[in-house]
Amino acid sequence: MPIHFTEERMKKVIADHDRWWRGELGRPLVRASITDAYPRGPRPKAPILAQENVHDFSWTPEEIVEALEWELESFEYLGDAYPVVDLACFGPGVLAAMCGATLDNSSGRVWFFPCEKDVTKLHIRYDPENKWARRIKDICRAGIERWKGSIIITMPDLGGILDVIASLCGTEELLYATMDEPEEVHRLILEAEQAWQEAYADFAAILAPQGCMTNWNGILSAGTTYIPQCDFAYMIGPDMFREFVLETLRRDTERIDNTIYHLDGVGQLIHLDMLLSLPKLKAIQWVPGDGKPGPEMWPEVYEKVCAAGKNIMIIGDGRTNSSLELLPKLGEKIYSGIWASSAEREDVVRYLKAMGIEA
């Protein structure tokens, strides 16, 4: 069965995403996918790639890609949506596994376990022949060969620099090291940055024929793009953030064309002013966190981000959050996504029109 999307649509979607990054789109960016709009063909034997099965190398990359395509056969793409395969299923911060950490998905979710808890003995190197790096690259190559840009493959979720270090040595060990052995933490930061850059370049070279790049957030870019993040920052104060995190984020934003920081949890709001001071950072994704009020309850955060000249990614279904209420103030700075059934299609189309978007 075909993927219901044209080459011309893909060109327009890429161009519109780039205009959004530059602040020239003149409207919000909204990806709206109807997940059950069309019938699928016979289901392939291979499973749909997910955290629970990434360890199963018995399926060839070609078989994995065939199953991923089958999943998308039923989708209709409205607004700024497009066909995409998300490789974040290998876990958040999979660079750690490519540098020696143990990837364990026996619980059904991917977790990473340290390879060396003594920070003075830990040395971080990207291994392009690591089994996880090779597996993901092989799947990327198979997808590029089969789809030739008609379905976009994301960059794997390599992770944030401090988060990768925490996976390699242990979060508690890293916290103690920031106080007891800060010089070792600074060394590890530089090593992790080098490993990250090498991994990014390795995957980017394979994905280059797509003519665009994206990540687990789905925001396309004709140039390089990534999601700098530091979940570790939830556990440290502003002084430590300034010493250990801010400059590595600055370097991230200066190396990559279009960046959006993953601001995860209310504990990170104390760092927001420093994040907004980064001139090359283009956008913020605000995630309040489990048990906290939903996205619609934080208009002051969105307004602060946009007042600093940054775009904002609003999580959750755009129809149920504050994007319409924020539209008069934030307008073209908003990005949101919708995944809906065919029974909801008319409602989705009405929402898109209210946002100034033709379905």
Predicted regions and their residues:
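Internal helix-loop-helix
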Residues: 60-63, 67-88
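A contiguous, low-structure linker/loop signature
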Residues: 84-122
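Active-site loop segments of alpha/beta catalytic cores
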Residues: 1-50, 54, 71, 78-84, ...
